[in-house]
Amino acid sequence: VHQGDGQTFSIQAQAGQFFQNNGISFVEPWLFGTRPTALSVSLNQSLVRYSDAYGSTQKLNIFSASVGLNRLLRWPDDYFSLYTGIQYQSYDFNNYPFQFGNTTEYNGSAKNFSFNVGLSRNSAGMDPIFPTQGSNIEASVKFTPPYSLFDKKDYSTMAAIDKYKWLEFYKVKLKADVYNTVVGKLVLRTVAEMGFLNGYNKELGAPPFERFYVGGTGLFGGRFDGRELVALRGYENASSTGGTIDDITPYGGATIYNRFAAELRYPISMNQTAKIYALTFLEGGNAWNSFGSYNPFQLKRSVGAGIRVYMGAFGLIGFDFAYGFDKTINGTEPAGSRTHFLMNQSL
């Protein structure tokens, strides 16, 4: 790699009590040598392993490979960028529960070949740690080929585990972050985001993977088992299955979610070596397992305060204290007080 061209080669390894995640990636930021066009290539291997209440080992192994292009655009203005990519994933699970339609399966395998397209506009300025003006708006779609529309199989008589040998779905996400200086150094950040997952064939519906799990901050490991974690402070992190007494995510994961937040931020120190700011927030969101049960006005609400510390050697570290006003799915009382720890996460 020629020095000074900005190429990045990285090796990543993460481990916790129940997971291991290893990956390598390469980024070429000037693929065509003119307007910035970044080529990214990555390989990743994840293993989730833990024991259930009966002492049996539950295992999930995921391999993924992806290639993507991110290009800065000149139209409609210079703040826009377009991402296109392809991804291959394989899932192998043993004694690990996944919700396949109305059936829970514990052993099997599945493959996922998907296309990704994302359009974003980022005018939030040069400081990603403490923006004071502008916005970051993103829209993306992830989709697979519609295999079931061409293979002429009768999925109504097929076993649940056999329906998803090759996953088919489309997944749409929207997110808007807006920053405004209120007075002096006080900054208001407002956030709105949503996601929707579905299949092409009503006999298949949404797949058991790629679902949304809402709650807490999702700090440790959940992103490695075929799901997407969505933060909602004031509530517990989503469990591995969803649907427990502490969950706001339905059993088997959600196919629709909404989240809204408003944060007031005030800088304590903006030194180059350490940036520190305090914040207070209002937040609301929820997750649903079907469009029929979707209600955008039925939100789980919370309020809280926190602090963020950014240091180059450690990245962004944060502590939030939150109170959830609403009941969980199977709870009888408000969620109550929660303390959240964050590390290099954008909520």
Locations of the language-model features?
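Short, glycine/acidic-rich beta->alpha junctions
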Residues: 61, 168-172, 298-301
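Gram-negative/organellar outer-membrane beta-barrel architecture
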Residues: 1-136, 234, 240-241, 317, ...
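Outer-membrane beta-barrel transmembrane domain signature
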Residues: 285-302
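Secondary-structure transition into beta-strands, especially the periplasmic turns and strand N-termini
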Residues: 73-80, 182-188, 271-273, 315
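C-terminal outer-membrane beta-barrel translocator/porin domains of Gram-negative envelope proteins
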Residues: 99-268, 280-281, 288-289, 343-344
